[in-house]
Amino acid sequence: MAMGPDVVRIAAVSDIHYSKSSHGALQPLFAQITESADVLILPGDLTDYGLAEEAKVLARDLTTTVKIPVVAVLGNHDYESGQMGEIVKILADAGVKMLDGDTFETHGVGFAGVRGFCGGFGRGALGAWGEPIIKQFVHEAVNEALKLESALARLRSDHRIAILHYAPIRDTVEGEPVEIYPFLGSSRLEEPLSRFEVTAVFHGHAHKGKPEGSTANGIPVYNVSHQVLKACYPDRPAFRLFELRTSSAETDAGVTPIADRRHWGRRSTDRGSTAPQQAQEENPSPS
């Protein structure tokens, strides 16, 4: 089937935890992503200890190797040293689209991103009751959900991609100790996703979770933590690659994971009217 400019390839990997000594560590991975995708998503934990020096190392590797748009949100590790503002500035100056209740559109696809927060899922979610510190904890999750809702509402693209660090559903954190589920995400983040008919959701944070799940309304959710990808797909480079058809006739097609590395090759915007075989849908391995 012909692969024209109405097909966008999205690469995603989270929790890369760049340190001061990480220079060059992921450049081979970034080079393959640049060759294969039209957009790269980085859903948080960009640095290990939340240091500006770590962000500078990542910025150098990205500017040297990645020649496609990069869209990112911060993760909890990026907050560790209180240097979030510096990290955002360093990466933004390097060309990364840093989202925090913001949006970005490219190739006919709209991206909305927030960090998200904790609180748990479903009937096990923490309620705003009791001590002020508990209410403050819950209100942080509520505020992140409201920021996500506001960002999604501003998108005018037919295809909307949500980028989070924390999980919006329980499915993709299964495999982690159940005792820490409340600290891995919040189902409050799920509500805006369904309201605005999001095409797909990408998150990280849960290093021992599952790579795929879905919201109650069937929206696909992908845990693209670097650690999950290495564990679940040991025979592949540690990033996920997806195709999204953006033609008006296929607005409901959603994203299709690409499993067969023979179909990775050049990104769609370079392929013009060439006609490789249609990529096969990926069957997720158990976590």
Label for each model-derived stretch:
Residues 109-157, 182-187, 237, 244:
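Binuclear metal-dependent hydrolase catalytic cores centered on His/Asp/Glu-rich metal-binding motifs
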Residues 12-14, 40-45, 70-76, 97-101, ...:
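Active-site neighborhood of phospho(di)ester-bond hydrolases with catalytic His/Asp-centered motifs
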Residues 81-82, 86-119:
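Hydrophobic alpha-helical segments and helix pairs
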Residues 22-26, 46-63, 74, 79-94, ...:
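Metal-dependent catalytic neighborhoods of phosphoester/phosphodiester hydrolases
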Residues 1-68, 78-82, 134, 138, ...:
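N-terminal active-site segment of His-dependent metallophosphoesterases
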Residues 7-17, 108-120, 161-163, 220-226:
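Active-site-proximal beta-strand elements of phosphoester/diester hydrolases
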Residues 2-7, 105, 179, 187-199, ...:
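Binuclear metal-dependent phosphoesterase catalytic core
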Residues 59, 126-132, 155-197:
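Active-site-proximal segments of metal-dependent phosphoesterases and phosphodiesterases across multiple
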